[in-house]
Design a protein with these regions (language model features):
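Catalytic helix-loop patch of NAD(P)-dependent Rossmann-fold dehydrogenases
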Residues: 73, 80, 84-88, 95, ...
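Rossmann-fold cofactor-recognition segment
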Residues: 30-45
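N-terminal Rossmann NAD(P)H-binding glycine-rich loop of SDR-like oxidoreductase domains
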Residues: 3-23
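NAD(P)H-binding glycine-rich loop region in Rossmannoid oxidoreductase-like domains
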Residues: 41-81
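Hydrophobic "lid"/C-terminal helical patch
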Residues: 16, 51, 167, 197-201, ...
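NAD(P)-dependent short-chain dehydrogenase/reductase
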Residues: 138-185, 191-199
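SDR active-site strand-loop-helix element
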Residues: 6, 29, 62-63, 100-105, ...
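Mid/C-terminal beta-alpha module of Rossmann-like enzyme folds, strongest
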Residues: 196, 203-237
Length: 237
């Protein structure tokens, strides 16, 4: 099986290199890869040409513009990376008969209510990030390609930028921090996402559609920060 992994150097992409390796020939690409394997999501046509050249059977897209606040001032770039390029990927996949695995977010919802949302819940993103990620989902679905879209939340990993690392850094820099306590979510390990992805690709019954994929339980950003800092204090230098 030939697998094209896009966004291989991010939190999820790095773990996917590990989990996908036993499945076949993994061609791992990112925006800073060597010339013939560069996958610059700001250039949709170039990503399409990369797919045409490699001719994969599975395309796993772990690339995204994930800076939620920054996306508000980089609307065009966010839309290109999160929506337009995934649409190009899906169109190429349909032509090849390839499977597309794509990662989305809980930001496609409006954040109201106090109950977990299922896959049939009505979407209503409020942020540029959420709107562009939802458009990416819609473009993939409209393409007619076989696809798996995993919506997840609060991703963390040893590699890359995430809430845990931000809290640890700020704790060293500041005497006091302010963290909100009214937003709930499920911190989800990139390793979990990668392992489930590998299992889904190998499933005896072909899987398609949108799935919510997050760790069990819930917490607030405040409780999450408290937990992280408490654990950090237990580590002996």
């Amino acid at each position: 099986m030939k697998i094209l992994l896009l966004g291989c150097n991010g939190q999820v992409g790095w773990e996917l290199q590990r989990s996908l390796a036993p499945l076949g020939d993994v061609i791992a690409c990112d925006f800073d890869s060597v010339t013939d394997r560069r996958a610059d999501f700001a250039k949709p046509a170039a990503v399409g040409e990369l797919i045409d050249r490699i001719q994969p059977q599975v395309i796993v897209n772990a690339a995204a513009h994930t800076a939620v606040d920054k996306a508000e001032s980089e609307i065009d770039l966010s839309r290109t990376i999160n929506a337009v390029t995934p649409g190009v990927i899906a169109d190429r996949a349909r032509a090849l008969g390839a499977l597309v695995v794509h990662y989305s977010t809980d930001y496609v919802f409006d954040g109201s209510g106090d109950q977990a949302r299922d896959e049939l819940a009505v979407t209503g993103p409020l942020s540029v990030y959420g709107k562009t990620k939802l458009e990416g989902e819609e473009r993939i679905r409209a393409s007619g390609c076989r696809h798996l879209i995993f919506r997840t939340s609060w991703v963390y990993a040893a590699r890359g930028h995430n809430f845990i690392k931000t809290m640890l850094r700020l704790a060293q820099e500041r005497e006091r921090m302010t963290v909100i306590n009214d937003q709930f979510g499920a911190p989800t390990g990139a390793a979990l996402l990668a392992d489930v992805t590998a299992l889904a690709i190998q499933a005896s019954r072909p899987l398609t559609g949108i799935y919510h994929l997050a760790a069990a339980g819930e917490t607030t950003w405040y409780a999450y920060a408290e937990y992280v800092l408490a654990k950090a204090k237990q580590i002996k230098p």
